Amino acid sequence: MARATGVAWTRDQRLIALNLYCKLPFGKLHKGNPIIKEVALKMGRTPSSLALKLCNFASLDPVLHARGIAGMSGAAREDRSLWDEFKANISVLGPQSEELLHNLLAFKADEEVDLLDHEKIQLQPSGTLIPPTGPTVATATVRVRRGQQFFRQSILSAYGVRCCISGINVPRLLVASHIKPWGEFPNERLDPRNGLCLSTLHDAAFDNGLVTLDEKLKVVLSKRLRAYFPQTALESSFVPYEGVAIRLPERLAEPSPDFLRYHREVIFKS
């Protein structure tokens, strides 16, 4: 495909770029990144153009601003509008952006476009799909899968592909954990404020109310978990982190205080 020069960005191209922004660290938003080069080629744009668009989105990210990172100034009105729309309607635009990226890069419907390497595109077999519930019907299965793929990669990437409690950085051992349960709150399923990057062990403990986070984002252990002490392996996985604040995400959104309050009051088994 010929590379566009001075050609206006389409809405679909902006959505693909915003999807990439959600998954790539700020330090990887440059024209030399192989992911940016390949996506730009498939889109018919230059790597410089795509990298600039990603940096424009970075200028709109409040978490980056809080870290003292400004991104590029002068984001287009269309970029600002899409950013606001994406935040307000992520349950629709998250899966849509993932499907657009998939159609651009993948060959099979059941492949996942994995960008967690941050410099290499990998096509992986899709993971286990959580069955649709409530108003979601079987015909929406692909959209649900794309949404889960988007949520997992964006949450893991926002936390630096590390468990926010333990610091474990093995992607296969990490989960994009939901603060408010996935099945009960469809409107918050893909909200980054409802996500934590946790190891599989800490995800299971959090999901079952054996650990929670206090108002200062410090780890709290339940009496039910402590009832299984002493066990060296168990204690070593939890006790060192008790009272320690979690690692915060590097972009997109910090955990919602309201969602965490719900977890403490409804799910946590003190």
Residue spans of the language-model regions?
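Short, Lys/Arg-enriched anionic-surface-contact patches
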Residues: A2-L20, V142
